[in-house]
Amino acid sequence: GRFQFVDSNTGVRQNLTPNAGVGTPQYDGSGGCTRSDDYHCFGTADRYNFAGQNLLLTPSERKGVFAQFRYYFNDDVQWYVKALGNRRESTNQAAPEPIFLGPDAGTGNPLADNIVISALNPFNPFGFDLDSATNLIQIGRRPVEGGPRRYEQQVDTQYFGTGLVGTFEGAGRTWFWDVKGMYSKNKAEQTNYGSYNLYNIYNINLALGDPAACAAVAGCVPLDIFSGAGSITPEMLRWIQPVVRDRSQNELSLFTANLSSELFQLPGGAVSFAGGYEYRKYEGAYQPDPLTVARRYNGLPSLPTSGSYDVNEAYLELNIPIFA
């Protein structure tokens, strides 16, 4: 962890991290980087190496089925049906998600930026409140105890289309026509493991506050972000680490009709004609997890959204060969 604050007792600005291997670090309030307590000045060597947690090959599994049916009523008219179903299951992984607290953390989430950590927190080694309004600058703690961030996706795609295709004779020429309808849907769900519920971290009366207030709330466990790796227990993680699910879907409905033929001959060739109509309707929706909507999730906040629009299109084409 990294702790940047102004000591309320001495007025000294600190930028510290616990020494390696220290279970319960002791703080003596001394300034500078020559220290007699269990901390040292934060430096480049203390930064986290992401490489070990990233995946070179992203797991992905696809399952699909496709079916097609075609029926000839006669030589001039045929009917077809196409259907498709596909499922993708994939996983992304990133380094353990950091917890950033304080005004310089820059999370954009007031639950993190405006935090107050009580001196009564049993794991607070500094002996005074850490208050974003007065002396707290920034706290950064990467809870390696919670494991890497994992994003599991399940994406289902369905497609169904049917139509008629044919020809007919009229006005001394052959006409080609087709009509079809189609519906497709793409539905996705992403489940995020390894993130943090900032509401429980923020509340001074709960995980980082007075232990008596925390004890009065079912499931609350005082949180230790002040010690080194291993200080956050499974019980603490269960209180602050939710499973976040975001869902989205897109739908497309389509109808189209087309007609074409050759109209007459010129020295350069046949003048041909094509015309048609197409209707499309697009629908989409995104439903983030309630924790995300409530701005209690450590990631970027977002709101549910949905919408749709229709498109009506018609076209007319002529192909006129000018030169032979």
What are these regions (language model features)?
Residues 2-62, 66, 72-311:
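Surface-exposed, low-complexity loop segments enriched in small/polar and acidic residues
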Residues 310-323:
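Structured alpha-helical segments in the cores of large, soluble enzyme domains
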